[in-house]
Curated annotation (Swiss-Prot):
InterPro entries: Ferrochelatase, Ferrochelatase_AS, Ferrochelatase_C, Ferrochelatase_N. Belongs to the ferrochelatase family. Pathway: Porphyrin-containing compound metabolism; protoheme biosynthesis; protoheme from protoporphyrin-IX: step 1/1. Its main location: cytoplasm. It comes from Shigella sonnei (strain Ss046). NCBIfam families: hemH. It catalyses: heme b + 2 H(+) = protoporphyrin IX + Fe(2+). Its EC number is 4.98.1.1. This is Ferrochelatase. Catalyzes the ferrous insertion into protoporphyrin IX. It is found in: Cytoplasm.
Length: 320
């Protein structure tokens, strides 16, 4: 009997192809049209999206992307490609494809790439450590849509999340320790996760619980007292309430209260991107220092570090 051939699909959110208003507009249109991301009535949402949000937001966001753009593309794309290549080197007999929910390379192109390698079974690893319907759910939906058009489909293993995975927590902890060794131990370690509307959590999305799990496990691995670690949520969009406390408001409050030294990590981001490099490392640094804080460091995402790649290899090992 022929041995089953396994392929790995690394999935992430996506990125514009260029730091231009036109490219950002195309990307945001696809992203903000997904009901998993914005579930508002289409009769209300389409005119607002096309008539107000895209024309006004695209030029501003393009400037932000330009401020962090790298030689090989957006940071998310550069680091995601590095992750794909490093994992392929770690698992030389296993094809590894990269697909994005929005933009290029698409999830469909990633599936087709693996099928062209004659794989019988695809292990899907969404690079979102904490499940949310708006991220992991979107990957699931798109994968189902893609496979629904195939006459023959491969076996599928779908990794829901890895919020409390031992290798993941250890990699985060080692990254924090390295930052403490370099910059000194701060008064507070702030863990900033991407937010979602509070309503999504009220309706059953267990994302906040998964974030709390990671926070608890990381604090335990570091041996830090609970009062020395704080969890917040960033990147809110629109007018409805999102998960709280908000990162920017918390940093302002901490600076005003006399907290002098803060280090910030974003455990929910597997790769550095606009939201970490610009929003957290730059914007929120200014918020904290402007409110009276003295010292602020951003701890980079795990990106393509050896520990992160080893974690990915171990995650998919059960399916190989």
């Amino acid at each position: 009997m022929r041995q089953t051939k396994i392929g790995i699909l690394l999935a992430n959110l996506g990125t514009p192809d260029a730091p231009t208003p036109e490219a950002v507009k195309r990307y945001l249109k696809q992203f903000l049209s997904d009901r998993r991301v914005v579930d508002t009535s289409r009769l209300l949402w389409w005119p607002l999206l096309r008539g107000v949000i895209l024309p006004l937001r695209s030029p501003r966001v393009a400037k932000l992307y330009a401020s962090v753009w790298m030689e090989g593309g957006s940071p998310l794309m550069v680091y995601s490609r590095q992750q794909q290549q490093a994992l392929a080197q770690r698992l030389p007999e296993t094809p590894v494809a990269l697909g994005m929910s929005y933009g290029s390379p698409s999830l469909e192109s990633a599936v087709d790439e693996l099928l062209a390698e004659h794989v019988d079974h695809i292990v899907v690893l969404p690079l979102y450590p904490q499940f949310s319907c708006s991220t992991v759910g979107a990957v699931w939906d798109e994968l189902a849509r893609i496979l629904a058009r195939k006459r023959s489909i491969p076996g599928i293993s779908f990794i829901r999340d890895y919020a409390d995975n031992h290798d993941y927590i250890n990699a985060l902890a080692n990254s924090v320790r390295a930052s403490f060794a370099k910059h000194g131990e701060p008064d507070l370690l702030l863990l900033s996760y991407h937010g979602i509307p509070q309503r999504y959590a009220d309706e059953g999305d267990d994302y906040p619980q998964r974030c709390r799990t990671t926070t608890r496990e990381l604090a335990s691995a570091l041996g830090m007292a609970p009062e020395k670690v704080m969890m917040t949520f960033q990147s809110r969009f629109g007018r409805e309430p999102w998960l709280m406390p908000y990162t920017d408001e918390t940093l302002k409050m901490l600076g005003e209260k006399g907290v002098g030294h803060i280090q910030v990590m974003c455990p929910g981001f597997a790769a550095d991107c606009l939201e970490t490099l610009e929003e957290i490392a730059e914007q929120n640094r200014e918020v904290f220092l402007g409110a009276g804080g003295k010292k602020y460091e951003y701890i980079p995402a795990l990106n393509a570090t050896p520990e992160h790649i080893e974690m990915m290899a171990n995650l998919v090992a059960a399916y190989r």
